[in-house]
Each structure stands twice: as C-alpha cells, then as structure tokens.
C-alpha cells in the first residue's frame, strides 16, 4: 500500500514540473521575437471608396530596423521617403499578439515568426483622419539570436 503522504509528494512534484514546463514554454515563445529585424515589405489595404491597395519593398528610401531585447525593451530606426526616424519603447507578447509601446504610441498587432521571417499584421479602425486599414509587414532576422 502506498502511503498517502507519498502520493501527495508525487502529485506536488508533477504539478511543479508542469508549471516549470509552462513557464519555460512561455519564455521560449517570447524568445522567438528577440533579435534584430530588417523591414522587407508592407502591403496595406485602405478601405476607402474605392478600396485601395499599396505595396512597398525595402529600398534606400524605405528602411526600418526593429531590435527586440529579452528585457522587454525595443528600439527602431529607419528612413521613410528620405525622412529619418527612431524611437525606443517596451514590448510584450500574449499568444499571437505583439504589443509595442513607444513614447505612449501603442501598436497592437498579430505576429508570426517562421524561420528567419517575422510577419506583423496590423488592423487600424477608421478615424476622422484615416480610413480603416489592414497591413501586413514582413521583416527578416538580421542576426539569429535563438
């Protein structure tokens, strides 16, 4: 006969192992995004009348580099139509959702990392200034940090 205390200890050990596995798995998911990412393309659909679609690929006038760090900070810098820009902020992931907050400007998007490519899907609701948009951005990992 197995003593009840041994059952409790075994059950507790199993629960601790499952908890540890869950924590490590969550950290592993976040680590997919850690690294340096270079902009490749953006395709946007503008729900105007008529609907418009535009695509832009990386060139000397359209560049961006995102750097995600393990401590939850990120930075970006780039060039858009000859104008340089840069900022820093905080990032977090929850399942397939990436949240970036740079100076109070929050971007929430779906993300997927497949090999050395990261895809960000951004949905923006219509406002007084802008039409509703759906954008897909692709970035390539510059330095594999996994």
Describe every region a protein language model picked out.
Residues 1-31:
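Bacterial Sec-dependent N-terminal signal peptides
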């Amino acid at each position: 006969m197995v003593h009840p205390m041994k059952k409790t200890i075994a059950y507790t050990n199993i629960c601790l192992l499952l908890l540890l596995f869950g924590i490590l798995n969550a950290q592993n998911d976040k680590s997919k995004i850690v690294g340096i990412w270079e902009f490749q393309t953006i395709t946007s659909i503008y729900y105007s009348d008529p609907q418009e679609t535009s695509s832009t690929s990386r060139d000397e006038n359209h560049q961006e580099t995102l750097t995600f760090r393990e401590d939850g900070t990120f930075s970006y810098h780039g060039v858009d139509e000859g104008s340089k820009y840069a900022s820093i902020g905080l990032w977090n992931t929850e399942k397939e959702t990436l949240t970036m907050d740079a100076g109070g400007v929050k971007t929430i998007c779906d993300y997927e990392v497949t090999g050395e490519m990261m895809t960000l899907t951004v949905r923006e609701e219509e406002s007084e200034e802008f039409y509703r948009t759906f954008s897909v951005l692709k970035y390539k990992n510059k330095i594999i940090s996994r």
